[in-house]
């Protein structure tokens, strides 16, 4: 009987040893493929509190000669897609897309990113947000899908999870977020005599004209 109990205990210990990896699934901060290193990062220098805006983002580091796509991919391609799972009282905005570069593929003109790019997303902390009593962190989960191309294109995806302290500062990637936000398309200052409400915006290689009235 004692030997049987010992055997059962050993079996239970073996099962428990494998439990964390199985229970946590595949979600993590970094996903690496042969073509891209993708990382979920955050910027919350003042912590997390109702009324605040916290920034998160997917940072893609491409292998040489590989690229992913902008929101307007051009003649071909598909933009990176982000699907968030957030705590109650936290809502995600749209990607604040930085300006892309023109990537010619044969006779096609595409718009996307090479090297390293950060796709920032604002999280709004609404009055409905309740501070977690036990952990002191909020958990941000992301399922992302991207099309990475050289000459051929390969669809890839990853599941990410990141904890952000409610109190305290998360600012390790401050410079990367600032650079990405600075690289957004800028509105051109209105010319003298322009109709109020009219605007001109440079978006990639396109000039968008909005005329009021």
Language-model-detected regions and their locations in the chain:
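Bacterial N-terminal signal peptides
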Residues: 6-18
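Extracellular/lumen-exposed scaffold segments
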Residues: 20-213
């Amino acid at each position: 009987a004692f030997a049987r109990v010992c055997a059962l205990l050993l079996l239970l210990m073996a099962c428990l040893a494998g439990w964390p990896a199985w229970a946590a699934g595949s979600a993590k901060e970094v996903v690496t493929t042969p073509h891209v290193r993708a990382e979920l990062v955050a910027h919350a220098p003042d912590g997390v509190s109702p009324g605040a805006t916290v920034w998160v983002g997917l940072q893609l580091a491409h292998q040489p000669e590989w690229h992913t796509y902008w929101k307007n991919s051009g003649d071909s391609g598909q933009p990176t897609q982000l699907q968030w799972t957030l705590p109650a009282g936290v809502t995600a905005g749209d990607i604040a897309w930085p300006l892309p570069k023109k990537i010619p593929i044969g006779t096609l003109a595409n718009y996307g990113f090479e090297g390293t790019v950060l796709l920032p997303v604002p999280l709004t902390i609404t009055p409905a947000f309740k501070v977690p009593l036990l952990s002191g962190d909020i958990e941000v989960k992301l399922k992302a899908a991207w099309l990475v191309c050289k000459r051929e294109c390969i669809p890839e995806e990853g599941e990410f999870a990141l904890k952000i302290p409610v109190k305290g500062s998360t600012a390790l990637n401050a410079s990367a977020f600032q650079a990405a936000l600075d690289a957004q398309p800028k509105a051109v200052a209105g010319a003298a005599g322009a109709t109020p409400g009219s605007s001109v915006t440079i978006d990639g290689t396109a000039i968008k004209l909005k005329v009021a009235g």
